[in-house]
Amino acid sequence: DTARVMREVLERPIKKVPALQGFTVATVFFEPSTRTRISFELAARRMSADVVSFAAQTSSLQRGESYKDTLLTLEAMGVDAYVIRADSAGVSHQATRWVKGAVINGGDGRRAHPTQALLDAYTLLEALGTLEGKKVAIVGDILHSRVARSGAELLSLLGAQVFCAGPPSLLPQSLPGAHLTPRLEEALEEADAVMVLR
């Protein structure tokens, strides 16, 4: 419901609500990103938050500063919420122990990308009306994809049958919530939606 309300906000001439006025959100990207970082920055600004954009390439990380020290420095500067993307699994989870503010996982090594899964589920729900009993195929490099991992988990929780297809060398041994197959035609047969990974 909140996503639909925010979608209506985007259709207004002035795309802003005061929900986060007075809050500071830091997008802390320890690895490069375009779509995820900009999406979060726009969302925070549209909810009237002040936004600090952190880029690892131009930070003290280049001189050996740890993720923890970087986040503690931002906390000392008054940051209220952190959107974190890291190439190492578990950084977002660890961050919840290091800082008092809210932590949003914007991509976590090969392990997870829950916010992308939420967006994909929302898109599919808008297109299909429901995910209950729908067949969703995820195709590509499943083994190394945090998008496939998070997507399969969430879509199956929402009632979808998830089939992941890729070459045998790019399929994990198992993936909670998904049927794995090296046969593309099996995944695509009677699929209601197809997600193709890069």
Where are these predicted regions, by residue range?
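Short, well-ordered alpha-helix to beta-strand connector turns
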Residues: 3, 79, 99, 159, ...
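Redox-cofactor binding/interface segments in oxidoreductases and associated redox assembly factors
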Residues: 27, 82-84, 195-196
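Short, structured coil segments at secondary-structure junctions
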Residues: 47, 98-100, 158, 176-177
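Glycine-rich phosphate/diphosphate-binding loop of Rossmann-like nucleotide-binding domains
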Residues: 30-42, 126-198
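Anion-binding alpha/beta catalytic cores of soluble intermediary-metabolism enzymes, centered on
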Residues: 69-154
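Short beta-strand elements in bilobed, periplasmic/extracellular small-molecule ligand-binding domains
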Residues: 48-61, 160-172
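Positively charged, low-complexity intrinsically disordered leader regions
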Residues: 1-42
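Short, charged, surface-exposed secondary-structure boundary motifs
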Residues: 62-63, 112-119, 173-175, 190-192
